[in-house]
Amino acid sequence: MEYPISLYYDTEVSDVKTLDLCRGDDDYRKVHIVDDGHRKLVIKYLSNTFSDRRRIEGWFALMNEYRKIGLYCPNVVPNLNGELLHCDTKDGRDYYTYAEEYSIYETAEHIGKDKYKDEQGHDCFTPDVMRSLGKIASAKLDMLDWASAYCLLEPFCAPDTTDEATECAVAFVNYVRDNIPAYLSRAEALLDMFYKRQEDLRKVYHSLPTSCFQADLNDSNILLDSNNNFVGLIDFNLCGKEPILNYAVREALWGISDNRLFGEKDSRLYFYDEELDNLRISLFLENIGYIQETYHFSSSEKDAFPILFRYINSFWWFHIDEIKLIKEDDNKINQLFDWLERQMTRDDIRLP
C-alpha cells in the first residue's frame, strides 16, 4: 500500500483521491482523501519552511480552542502506531504526516457561490464568521509563539524577506517601472509614503493585544451546514498569534463582497468612484460591528486603528492585477494612484 496511507490502513484501499498542493521545492504538500468503506480520512503529507513538529502540534491545540467556542473542526486521528503526528526523514529533510476525519460539513467553495451569495453578492456566512472572530479575540489565546500568515512588519517564513504588504508594494512599483515608466516617479513617491506609514505602525504595533487565529478564511476552508450557515473551519497550517486589531481589520476588509464594487475581470470599481468607495467603507464598518458583538476593542486599539488602517488599506495583490488591467488608460492610472495616496493619508475613519 502506498505510503503514507499505510500508516492508517492495514488493508488495500481502492477509494483514494490525491491532491498535489506542492508549490515549488520548498513547499511540499500532498493530501490523500481515503475511504475504506468504514471510515473516511484526509491524510496530509507535507514538508515546508513553516511546518515542523512544534507548529503542527500547535495547529492541533488551536483547533481544540476553536471547538471550545462552538466551531466544528474535524478531529485529528491517530495512525496505526497510535501517533497523532508522524515524522520521517528523507535526504536530510523532515516530512510530516497527520490525518483528520473527513468533514461532516461541506466547504463554501464546494457548495458554490450561487448557493451562499445573495442577490447583491454578499456572502451569507460573513456575519457569523466575524462574530466567531470576535469570540477568538476575546479568548486572548496564547498557546502559539509564532506569527500567522497575516503578520505585519516581519516575514511569515523563509524564503520571505518582508511582510506580504511590503512584497505587494514593491511588486506594484516594479511593474510600473517595467511597463509604464512614465508613472515611475509617482509610484516611487507612493512607495516612500508606504514606508513612512510602516514606520508609524511599528511604533504602536507590538504593544497591541493578541490572540491566536486560523488565518486563512477563504471559501475552501469555511464549512457550512445544509442551510448555508457557518459552522466551522479546516486547514490551520497558516495559523499563529496576531495583534487582534490587525486580524480583525483585515478580515473585515477582505470579508466585503458586493456586486456593485466589482467589474469585469474583478476590476475594483471603487478605485474610480468615491461613492462606491464610501459603500466599501460602510460595509467594512458593518463587519467590524459584527466583530464587536463578541469583542470590545481597547482604547489602545482604537487609538492605533487609523495608523494600521493607512498601512493595510493601501497595497495588496489586487492593486497589481488592477494596474495590469488599466495600463493603457491614463485616466484610470491617475485615479488609482490618487486612491492609493488617499488611503495612506486618510484620517476620517474610527472604530465605533
Regions found by a protein language model. Name each.
Residues 19-25:
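Protein kinase glycine-rich loop
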Residues 318-352:
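Helical subdomain adjoining the active site within ATP-dependent kinase catalytic cores
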Residues 149-202:
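Active-site catalytic-loop/activation-segment of kinase and kinase-like phosphoryl-transfer enzymes
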Residues 1-18:
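Juxta-kinase regulatory segment immediately upstream of eukaryotic protein kinase catalytic domains
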Residues 27-38, 42, 196-246:
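Active-site acidic catalytic loop and adjacent metal/ATP-binding pocket
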Residues 245-296, 309-327:
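Active-site activation/catalytic loop segments of kinase-like enzymes and analogous catalytic loops
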Residues 39-144:
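ATP-binding pocket architecture of kinase catalytic cores
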